[in-house]
Amino acid sequence: MTDKDLRKISSIVVDGVEQAPSRSMLRAVGFEDGDFKKPQIGIASTWSMVTPCNMHINKLAEDVNKGADDAGGKGIIYNVLTISDGISMGTEGMKYSLVSREVIADSVETVSGCMGHDGIITIGGCDKNMPGLLMGMARLNRPSIFIYGGTIQPGPNHTNIISVFEAVGGHAAGTVSDIELKNIEETAIPGPGSCGGMYTANTMASAIEAMGMSLPNSSAQDAISREKVEDCLSAGEAIMHLLEHDIKPVSYTHLRAPRDQRGSRMPSSA
């Protein structure tokens, strides 16, 4: 397979005399001569400071970018939005929650579709951005990988977000004091990562891995860990493999998803 075969889409954007203006703009964001002969890998980051689930994803995106470049591609990072159900629930803000999933899917489809990315790697770690990213990749149906941002570390005495909700209930019942409630509030969520339990994000991560859209063990790694860094770096080699063999989401998720997400064993011929 030639280099041109690996960049069937981006070659339309950057090859030939007529595309000199496009190349000129890409040079401003760091492209050099050799980069125009590499497959372009769109890296969709859901980094945001609106929620701890995604506050570290900018660093993961940089690791993914390095992995893509080292594997012979050219990584291009871009951002898509994210919101937090955990923060907005019970308020008018939840009216935007489900809609955000569609906006995220639209964003991936719009950016990578517009810019001519040959492959796509998305990074997410919250209730709506994870399915939204998958929807965007499926719509474009180009070689794609999802990377889970990873789970958060527990607070003292194995506390997590549920501990805070329970403390609110205990406070209402008179079994948790003001001081105890404040202490749990301040310590239960110590840093980056998705809610520490089999809630929506970790469940989605497991389902996505079962579908074959993320690398093995991606769903079981801490947000801040050497394993998660290696997961990000390995994605570059994996996306190049998908490009070389023209493996796309729709070609395998429709076979794996219904059975694997239910925990059923796949037939040996699958």
Where are these regions (language model features)?
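Conserved small/polar residues in nucleotide/adenosyl-binding loops
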Residues: 253-260
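Hydrophobic alpha-helical segments, chiefly the membrane-spanning helices
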Residues: 264-270
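Gly-rich Lys/Arg/Thr-decorated short loops/hinges at beta-loop-alpha junctions or inter-strand turns
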Residues: 3-10, 41-48, 82-94, 185-190, ...
